[in-house]
Amino acid sequence: MSESKRIKTALVSVYHKEGLDEIITKLHEEGVEFLSTGGTRQFIESLGYPCKAVEDLTTYPSILGGRVKTLHPKIFGGILCRRGLEQDMQQIEKYEIPEIDLVIVDLYPFEATVASGASEADIIEKIDIGGISLIRAAAKNYNDVIIVASQAQYKPLLDMFCLLYTSPS
């Protein structure tokens, strides 16, 4: 991500919410807007911060029992849009796609579900499609988007924000 660009919009969609509150608070303090899915959106709102539902942006509901939530051009276009390419910028303007500058996502606990002896049906539902797609899209556009793909990356992100956005006294 370019040094001078501030994060305006963060897509947050996580299974594990522990430790997320500190990140959300810091992002909110810096004026970052949140875009999220069901449970994560409710978590962010429970902290007292506004959060736009993915469904409001896409104008499409979560379908197939929650299997399809973020797989939409208005989400992936906002992540994959190359900010320095005029053609990309014209297209996102034409289709009213917001730039997404930060993606915070983690994957369903597939291995833990398998190890728990869960049923095949439960195991299959823990195969994450949207989460891994978001990670790959953000990684592909690493020049313009920051990706946080696990709880282990929350502290480094928080440290980065403290360095970038805290004025020396």
Where are the regions a protein language model picked out?
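A short, charged helix-loop
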Residues: V105-E125, I129, S133-L164
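Short acidic, glycine/serine/threonine-rich loops at helix termini
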Residues: E22-I23, E45-Y49, D56, I63-G66, ...
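Conserved small/polar residues in nucleotide/adenosyl-binding loops
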Residues: Y165-S169
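Conserved active-site and cofactor/substrate-binding residues in soluble primary-metabolism enzymes
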Residues: K5, E18-E22, L35, G39, ...
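N-terminal glycine-/serine-/threonine-rich phosphate-binding loop
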Residues: S2-S36, T40-K52
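Structural motif
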Residues: K8-L11, V32-E33, K52, F76-I79, ...
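Glycine-rich nucleotide/cofactor/substrate-binding loop typically near the N-terminus or early
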Residues: G39-P109
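Gly-rich Lys/Arg/Thr-decorated short loops/hinges at beta-loop-alpha junctions or inter-strand turns
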Residues: E3-I7, T70-F76, F110-S119, A139
